[in-house]
């Protein structure tokens, strides 16, 4: 089953388009053959990067060091949903009660 994994950055964490594109490129290389980076969007107070994967938990585990090395985990929320579903499960921050939405 395919899932959509979303990396969401709020506020000024990743508000620069060049920074989003650079992170997408790093993730594309890092996930080659494992998952597909499927683009991004930038809203008024958030930026999202979308990844298609059959293993969202494993994929997050694989990219977590990339995000941590770039000091992006602190301002990030990471969630996933089945490609055919609407309800997201939050992976990061751990034990989050936040209802996840993509604006």
PLM regions and their residue ranges:
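Short glycine-/aliphatic-rich beta-strand segments at the starts of folded cytosolic domains
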Residues: 1-14
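Short acidic, S/G/P-rich loop/turn micro-motifs used as interaction or catalytic elements
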Residues: 12-16, 56-58
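Short amphipathic alpha-helix segments
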Residues: 17-33
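Short, intrinsically disordered low-complexity segments
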Residues: 33-66
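Conserved short beta-strand edge segments in small beta-sheet-based binding/regulatory domains
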Residues: 69-86
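Short, low-order "capping/linker" segments at domain edges
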Residues: 85-103
């Amino acid at each position: 089953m395919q899932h959509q994994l979303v990396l969401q950055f709020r506020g000024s964490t990743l508000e620069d388009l060049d920074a989003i594109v650079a992170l997408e490129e790093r993730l594309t290389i890092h996930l080659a053959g494992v998952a597909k980076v499927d683009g991004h969007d930038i809203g008024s107070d958030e930026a999202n990067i979308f990844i298609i994967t059959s293993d969202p938990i494993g994929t997050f585990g694989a990219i977590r060091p990339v995000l941590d090395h770039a000091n992006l985990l602190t301002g990030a929320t990471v969630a996933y949903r089945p490609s055919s579903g609407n309800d997201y499960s939050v992976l990061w921050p751990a034990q989050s009660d936040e209802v996840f939405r993509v604006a």
